[in-house]
Amino acid sequence: MAQEVLKDLNKVRNIGIMAHIDAGKTTTTERILFYTGINRKVGETHDGGATTDWMEQEKERGITITSAAVTCFWDNNQVNIIDTPGHVDFTVEVERSLRVLDGAVAVFDGKEGVEPQSEQVWRQATKYDVPRICFVNKMDKLGADFYFTVGTIEDRLGAKPLVMQLPIGAEDNFDGVIDLLEMKALTWRGVTPIGTEATVEEIPAELADRAAEYREKLLETVAESDEELMEKYFGGEELSIAEIKAAIRKMVVNSEIYPVYCGTAYKNKGVQPLLDAVVDFLPSPLDLGETKGTDVKDPEKVLTRKPSDEEPLSALAFKIAAHPFFGKLTFVRLYSGKVEPGEQVLNSTKNKKERIGKLFQMHANKENPVEVAHAGNIYAFIGLKDTTTGDTLCDANAPIILESMDFPDPVIKVAIEPKTKSDQEKLGVAIQKLAEEDPTFTVELDDESGQTVIGGMGELHLDVLVDRMKREFKVEANIGDPQVAYRETIRKPVESLSYTHKKQTGGSGQFAKVIITIEPYAPAPEELEEGESAIYKFENAVTGGRVPREYIPSVDAGIQDAMQYGFLAGYPLVNVKATLEDGAYHDVDSSEMAFKLAGSQAFKEAVAKAKPVLLEPIMSVEITTPEEYMGEVIGDVNARRGQIASMDDRAGAKIVKAKVPLSQMFGYVGDLRSKTQGRANYSMIFDSYAEVPANVAADVIAERNGTAS
């Protein structure tokens, strides 16, 4: 079959490979690419040869940092795969990939089961309602336990796994799987070179009873999903393979169940059946139906687009990447319509026209040019100047804005100081390009020191960004120590604070009076309306036109400006609700600027009386350690102001879960290594913001304000 973009959307799968770091996502992707004929030589992450790991840093570190998009073909179906990073610092890559995918393969380590980042990625996939199948990988690993891993999918993720295969053997003796649909054994005995096909055999006698038990569970799940099938099954009739597959597919598309497969990608066992499952059970763009968006002129009005070339164009830009020859690549999911090189489209998010230069389907960092981009597929566009992540591209005659993506604020910052004037100029270019690519990378200028401060999701995230500045943009710079992204908030309401802004300097003056109330604001996620933030809410309670309508947004803007610099140490304020209750204006002297200044000053005065406190990021930390080091590990967590949440056993080791302030976690990897002779490891993800204890807060505030003794 010609390796070209398929127009039959029933045969297209847009999938992601997602997991915890080191569960084997990239290796699984490499094997898929080999078996689908894209790679003649298979790449390994440990030798820096993986196709989807194409950045220099990825090759060096053996982890996937950016989501590489790859197109391949299996059994006359087109599979567009996005290999997403498992490291928590790169959660934005996972988030934006899931937004544009139709299905995903969740890869789990057969020894570890569900790990912290697995939970985080699973939650992100649930947020975007992405159907999933599961692959229990590394079945050849010492301590691998398929049944334990399936149990963790149920217990830790609250998901309903549907076991489709059973392992034959484990660890060094893992030889294959039992296919519970066909009730046959698929074996890859001994050392299996890449490309080895499975041998179909009868089920080993010692596993026959267990296979029959799991087959019955599978059939019961299928029967319970459909009345007709239930009557047939419980009436003693045989269900056909086609009926079983159709029922499973329907449940998967509705995210009711999650089929579970197993194997070892590195040893080339179990990959082909996983590919069959992708085609059999994960949805095509047609299964998911219409895409929703809003009217450009009326955000309350919902518009829909069917996945068809005949519909008006609607597409979402989900990633920007720099290309050494073509400049800016914009990765786009086309939901409806079609587009050709040279066409003009509307960026409805920014209300700007864009012209498409070239169109590509990507194979990691290699490009395959296409003449027409069709609905339902993923492409890279060249030539878009103003489009950034989350923007909608559409037909100017039928504008629509698709749901964008929310990205978390950075939790860690470092100061970066260019070594020469030439480096200063190069740094400006580097920052602009990197910020275009990565919405969680922030840049600000410290007013006091004059330094450029960059922010990100963790130490590794910033390490990689700084490394890219040096490598790709030739910036030489000194990097400061990590800084914690503290926040401030208030603990008590302040009612009816009045402030009058008045200035008379000859001619027309400035006059604005506002009366505001501020209060702590912490709504539950389900209480928020679409588009509302938990960080800040503004309410207008003015009656009788005492503040003209056109000045109300200026008061809101003034308050939001003031929130950027808190009362205690100049950190941004969060979780505040402000209500404009009353005010006064002057026909001649009032203006938008006067009301903006009045709102800002009134808010500052109110915050000073509202018991402001400092907040710090708290990390959810999971430490895996041999039992003999438990005392050391727990003592160290307590010394870091951490709180132990739970202690469990897993695969012969102890698991300590704790909540620890980020400020106490810098350099932890080295400390943990030395305390446990290198035998313990840990992972951490951002959990929440919490109030800093008064004695610690006093030191942070003094240091920030330059009054530390």
Curated annotation (Swiss-Prot):
The keyword Repressor does not apply. The keyword Lyase does not apply. GO terms for molecular function: GTP binding; GTPase activity; translation elongation factor activity. Residues 10-286 form the tr-type G domain. Gene3D superfamilies: 3.30.230.10, 3.30.70.240, Elongation Factor G (Translational Gtpase), domain 3 (3.30.70.870), P-loop containing nucleotide triphosphate hydrolases (3.40.50.300), Translation factors (2.40.30.10). SMART domains: EFG_C (SM00838), EFG_IV (SM00889). GO terms for biological process: ribosome disassembly. GTP binds at residues 19-26, 83-87, 137-140. Pfam families: EFG_C, EFG_III, EFG_IV, GTP_EFTU, GTP_EFTU_D2. Its main location: cytoplasm. One of its GO terms (cellular component) is cytoplasm. CDD domains: EF-G (cd01886), EFG_III (cd16262), EFG_mtEFG1_IV (cd01434), EFG_mtEFG_C (cd03713), EFG_mtEFG_II (cd04088). PROSITE patterns: G_TR_1, G_TR_2. It comes from the Bacteria. Catalyzes the GTP-dependent ribosomal translocation step during translation elongation. During this step, the ribosome changes from the pre-translocational (PRE) to the post-translocational (POST) state as the newly formed A-site-bound peptidyl-tRNA and P-site-bound deacylated tRNA move to the P and E sites, respectively. Catalyzes the coordinated movement of the two tRNA molecules, the mRNA and conformational changes in the ribosome. Belongs to the TRAFAC class translation factor GTPase superfamily. Classic translation factor GTPase family. EF-G/EF-2 subfamily. This is Elongation factor G. It comes from Corynebacterium glutamicum (strain R). The lineage of its organism: Bacteria, Bacillati, Actinomycetota, Actinomycetes, Mycobacteriales. The gene is fusA.
